């Protein structure tokens, strides 16, 4: 097997089938016909002389050889993408791509403003914003699928030695009430008042929920006594429910700026209790860092930093393979952007 027995297209097809769980959905994702996908897999299996899928069940299941090829295939695809981006930087071509990851609240309310500022300075750079759970976002950075990310939770333990994690900003979490709620008239509310409220919350596994429970417990508030009447899967749904008078909720203050201006929600300070969490910037120091990501780190991140121990951008450029040049890439006005949103955090 001296020649390489597969192509990048075949690796992309394998990855799509593994992700989608079926040949048909993979074909739809790749905008090709199902017979074309099946033929490529058959050719690949013939070249490798091993089956890559168990075809007995309703869902396409990878064999041991399939898992092995998928593992290396994802690395090959990522390295090819990094190579193309490095060559773009070397030739100083117009354009380029910046891929930013974020957990839900950060990605929904903070990152669009940051990306807007970046696009004003670099309109020809394509920006992709991927909004997922903290865990999935961290793995995206580790695997080289995301240039950098801003998260509100903790990096998974298994990645803490792989990624560089630096404090970036403080995010204040506030108790919100309907504007006509009786407690909305008080300057502050007592801890005991919390036990009388009906709460609307994200699910118990969300990052914000865990932070709130931890801080309230530190403030000698028994979170088990709080009445969770409803669990929703997005901050927007929670805000709408509170506006409709269905209960109270804890949300990031960055998520309710518009509602406060319109006077449709009320923040109720809790006496002697402040709820804050630290937002962190994460990068993979062992991956190539493009000029676009270097410019974003140096020029945009400091404009929004609020943490007392906030990052020094130069600490993110220790890797000799990173791009230390944040020069402007192109001066066109046809920049593109995309947003990918997944699960709650």
From Swiss-Prot:
The record ties this protein, via InterPro entries, to: LysR_subst-bd (IPR005119), Tscrpt_reg_HTH_LysR (IPR000847), WH-like_DNA-bd_sf (IPR036388), WH_DNA-bd_sf (IPR036390)
Query: What GO molecular function annotations does the UniProt record carry, in alphabetical order?
Result: DNA-binding transcription factor activity; transcription cis-regulatory region binding
Give a yes or no for keyword Transcription regulation in this entry.
yes
Q: Which residues form the HTH lysR-type domain?
A: 6-63
Q: Which UniProt keywords apply?
A: DNA-binding, Transcription, Transcription regulation
Q: Which residue ranges hold the DNA-binding region?
A: 23-42
Biological process terms in GO annotation: regulation of DNA-templated transcription
Location of the region described as Disordered in the Swiss-Prot/TrEMBL record: 311-345
Q: Output the Pfam families linked to this UniProt entry.
A: HTH_1, LysR_substrate
Q: Where is the composition biased (Basic and acidic residues)?
A: 328-339
Q: Which CDD domains does its entry note?
A: PBP2_CysL_like
Q: What does this protein do?
A: Trans-acting transcriptional regulator of RuBisCO genes (rbcL and rbcS) expression.
Family, according to the entry, reads as follows: Belongs to the LysR transcriptional regulatory family.
Name this polypeptide is given: Probable RuBisCO transcriptional regulator
Supply the source organism for this entry.
Answer: Synechocystis sp. (strain ATCC 27184 / PCC 6803 / Kazusa)
